[in-house]
Amino acid sequence: MVFSTSRKGGRGVCPGTFVILGMLCALPGAVVASIGTAVVVPAADAVVLSRDDTAMATAASAALPAPGLSPDRLAQALRALVEQSRASGSPRPLGLAAGLLDRLPASQWTAEVYLMRATIHQRLHRFDLAEADLDQVLELAPGNRQAWLTRYSIALVRGDLDSARRACERLQDGRAGLVADSCRQELASFGEEPEQAYEQLTQALVRGDNLNTTERDYALVTQAEMATRLQLPEAGDLWQRSLLRDPADLYRRARYADWLLAQERAQEVLLVTQGFEAVDTLAVLRAIAMTRLQHPQQPRLVGELEERFAEARWRGEFLHEWEYARFLLDVKNDAQAALAAAQANWETQRAPVDRLLLRRAAMLAGQPSGIDESGQAGRSTL
């Protein structure tokens, strides 16, 4: 089985990093371009991003004849569509994937088919349905590490530390490795000694320098997440290194751009997001940077984003409450509306970035956030 990970459960730009463990996602020797003296990003020709994801996904669907469709072929096609959604940032291939599932009776579904449907639900923020499918996977294959890792990712994005700990324990069963180290130290970083947890993961990365390349890649992204949350100065370098390892990964690009915004480096955000205006999350971050810089092209991009958000709501595809709240707060300067969007986002997503957004929107709106701010170590939720 191909082992893959969906980092952080359901962030709109690709519910995170969908890394295929055992397959090399990085582009070795990718051409890079320097931005000023500090920022390095892949050159445009190092990134391959589909401009017509729906057409490609439709072709993939048409290539599967209903008669004689096997569970293995179905799982392979579903994985291709999920990857297409990840690469483009669009949910539309996921709708085609859902249609493919109807072409094989559920009585013939394998653990891998259930796993792919769980991933589809996860990307669409249908976390309860994803969990139900993961139950099916683990009933058929109790040791399926991909299912446990997906469960861990969903638990984190929902702020359910108890469930995340249980999933992480199963990832450690009988197998050491950087993925197990990553989840263990990431969870420890929410406790009383977060800096120690960060150092432990850093040491594990040093020890595992020659281990599975993609597991190492996963650990590096986790390290960057932890450094950002702990406000460590090396966070930017870690995001930069992570992005250079996989230039096509939209999640890393967005997290790096957001880190740059937090450092008041708006000009560099324009370079990191250049050419990715079709991806809502990156377009919003670009619009924030343009707003701060009073860029002459800001009104055009803002108008496009307003149209996209309106169309997405009309189509029933609105998955980007976090992005919409950021847009309202940092571009439109409408704290009250941003607070409503941040609260809607908090209903399903309770990762640290979601908490930070809700607290900031509430503060600027002069309203209580409604978040438990006890901050007790050993807590069961974020």
Residue ranges and their predicted role:
Residues 92, 125, 159, 192, ...:
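Residue-level detector of the short coil/turn that links helix A to helix B
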Residues 79, 83-86, 119, 153, ...:
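Residue-level recognition of tetratricopeptide repeat
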Residues 29-112, 123, 132:
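N-terminal leader/linker segments that initiate helical-solenoid repeat arrays
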Residues 115, 119, 216-217, 291, ...:
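Alpha-helical adaptor scaffolds
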Residues 65-68, 102-107, 135-142, 169-177, ...:
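Solenoid-like repeat scaffolds
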Residues 70-77, 108-114, 140-148, 175-183, ...:
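Generic helix N-cap/helix-start motif at coil->alpha-helix transitions
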